[in-house]
Amino acid sequence: MHWHPQRVKHGFEGTLLDESGRVEDENFTSDYRQWFQTKAPGKNPDATGIGWNDHTASIYKLPENLHPTYWTGEMACELISNYDPTNKPLFLKVSFARPHSPYDPPQRYLDMYEDALIPDPAIGDWCGKYAKKLNPEKTAQDAPYGNFGNEYARNSRRHYYANITFIDEQIGRIIQTLKEKDMYNDALIVFISDHGDMMGDHYHWRKTYPYEGSTHVPYIVKWPSVDHVTPGKTDAPVELRDILPTFLDAADVTIPTDMDGRSLLPLAKGMETTWRKYLDLEHATCYSDDNYWCALTDGKIKYIWRIHTGTEELFDLTQDPQELHNAVNDKKYRKQLTEMRNEMIRHLSERGEEFVKDGRLVVKEKTMLYGPNYPGKENKR
């Protein structure tokens, strides 16, 4: 999803699309919406009235087998059931639009969390300015920042968790279908997400932020039985760019030397290997002028550089996993701050003097909001 043109295949033999209403127009109707109208003619697939960037919540108004989460799981199961594994290997990408908003689970999944202890948002000692809605163009329910109260946040979280459980059930159906086709043991399965959701932490909502709620994602790999990988967990900083090299390595295909990312197979097998020290994170301007940042983290410490304002943030994730305290002015973290700042200087220096000049990070007054080839948009701050 989110490709342009929507039907471009990028190496796949075919696609079935659910764009959650984002780009539906007279020239494009997603496969899900076409299917929906055959199953529920005249009904509104957006009957909850919640937008795809809203953080309010409501139960799904229609039978759950009409929900896009169910449709995605059903299409995957049908494809696997009808696939001939003796023909050639199957590469299948199953992308659930949820738990991205709208937070709209069917009632029975929400009921599972009726008595659950839902945590309040984490509120740091640094985020007071975000308590007020900073973007007057946004309505209350899609404001990127704001203090909407703990009860509101817990309600949104309850629906968010329920949507995750809904997805979990669909993944179970897919795994069962693979087993019925005798394809499971030899399958390489990766469960990931492209981003998280702040869910009110530090008065932030949605994504695009350098904080854990937005950037920290699930990353679960089920290896083929032939790889003889012992189940376990790694603390090495891994990222989404590692997926393609991992696929190539597992298929015994040579990984191009200029490819971003690293194969996870050596880590999974416990082999000695040099690994990256930090993950580099970055997002261009979004929601507010100061939300253009670069960050480095090894999972234990995180340094954030805000390019438009020249402000820094430092979080000790070992002692402060919820990022409640910005340690940038703490004397006891002075050494770590200097080390991380120097790492950022080294990281950005290859981009030239617009980012690093005379050994110092540069505050940039103007940046591109969109890339030069982004369809229908002009380059602007």
For each of these PLM feature ranges, what is it?
Residues 1-63:
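Catalytic-site neighborhoods of secreted/periplasmic enzymes
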Residues 5-6, 58-61, 65-74, 90, ...:
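Polar, surface-exposed loop/tail segments
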Residues 33-34, 43, 212-215, 281-329, ...:
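C-terminal, low-complexity/hydrophilic appendages and adjacent surface loops
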Residues 102-105, 176-230, 239:
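Histidine-centered active-site microenvironments of extracellular/periplasmic hydrolases
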Residues 65, 129-130, 154-165, 209-217, ...:
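A short beta-strand-to-alpha-helix junction
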Residues 78-124, 140-155, 198:
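Active-site His/acidic residue clusters
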Residues 144-155, 327-381:
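Long, internal low-complexity/basic segments
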Residues 70-84, 120, 145-187, 250:
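A long, amphipathic alpha-helix that forms part
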